[in-house]
Amino acid sequence: ERKQIGPMETLEFRQAMAGAKHPWRFTAQNMSDGTLRALGVLTALFQRNPDHAPTLIGIEEPETALHPAASRALREALNRAAKHTQIIVTSHSPDLMDDPDLDADTVRAVIAEGSETHIAPLDSGSQDAMKQHLFSAGELLRLNQLAPDPENILDQQRQVSLFGEIEP
């Protein structure tokens, strides 16, 4: 619930407590960072204004400050929202990626080489392991085996310049 405090507004959270006649009330400043971040992520994912709904939502490390046990609920929310809009998520969290139904074709791996960063689809070994349900993306990440496809990286290095010339 929105609550007016002088010229400013905050959110007021209510929590039903066993044995209490009325719910406990907390303002946003008394809530954990993880709770507030989760609320922000859920708000971004489930906006339903048909005139202004986003076609793309980017979320960087949505699991930050979130209890690891909440990763599954966050994954489910991301999957539900992805049915209505394109969502790009960056994460270092194996817990968030521990979904056996995560499609290997939707995962991208990042590698830093020198002063360059490359983003590419997974290499064939990682894709096969996921498609055969031998490992989840999270398990591969824990084992340091989630790798980008080297052929795709080579293709990226042969980019067309601004004026149409192919660079080596």
Sequence positions of predicted segments:
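ABC ATPase nucleotide-binding domain "signature" loop
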Residues: E61-L66, L96
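GG-anchored amphipathic helix commonly corresponding to the ABC/SMC/Rad50 NBD signature/C-loop
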Residues: Q15-K21, T27-I59, A69-A73
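A generic structural signal for well-ordered coil/turn residues at beta-strand boundaries
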Residues: P7-E9, T35, D103
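Extended helical coiled-coil dimerization/tether regions that scaffold
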Residues: E1-N30, E151, E165-I166
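Loop/turn-to-beta-strand initiation segments
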Residues: A53-T55, H67, A82-I88
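Active-site flanking residues adjacent to catalytic metal/cofactor-binding acidic residues
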Residues: I59-E60, S91
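C-terminal lobe/lid and adjacent interdomain/linker elements of RecA-like ASCE P-loop ATPase modules
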Residues: A73-P168
